Amino acid sequence: MALINLGFDLQNRFPIQADIFRTGHICIVGGTGSGKSIATLYILYGILSLYHEVQLYIGDFKKSGDYKGITKSFEEFEQVTGLIEKFYGIFEETEENSPAIKILILDEYAGFITWLTQKDKKKCEEIKGKIANLLMLGRSRHCYVWCIQQRMSAQLFPSGIGAIDNFQILIGLGRLSVDSRKSLFAGEHLDKDFEEGYSPICGQGLILVDGQPLRAIQIPFIKDKGRMTALLRKKTNQ
């Protein structure tokens, strides 16, 4: 078992870690400027530093440019639909306990689902169903989904099957809306005195890892995001 660093506990300064094979599905929520992409790149770098058999599939719906060149399996805007279908097909062909880690990263997932609902509601329900299946069944095949988005809502997934519960790592950065806080961390609280005065800035927020308590997280400060992306390109091309 190799532990991946996710950030640091703001209260005790200890690293927050997780076993990617047990907790591979990740959801990161936060508004513009909250540090979502930095958190994603930081966690991804940790995985690529420990594992060589990692296959990345990245959908950058709003063309942020933060992930370009990291993998050849990269799509933007409407092509993200095809990328999800491609990954799902690979998942179906993958055997249990596959040695390779396969990760589907969907940046601005909520925006993508909103757009697809307006364009083709039937196709959107089909895509949401595939994402739900990946969340429920992907872990045993080491096929993982990372959803990066500005808000969290149960409407982003098929109703009645609890797809959100299958994210083993939930990260909320910056000031969360009431709905996002409830969807991500319902019934979970920090120490009362600390939480009452906690006003997270960029790179700070809350994290809930499966089997661990809710904690306040600090993502390491990275001044040059472009350099981080370049390092990831180098890692994936080795």
Residue ranges and their predicted role:
Residues D179-Q238:
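Conserved P-loop NTPase
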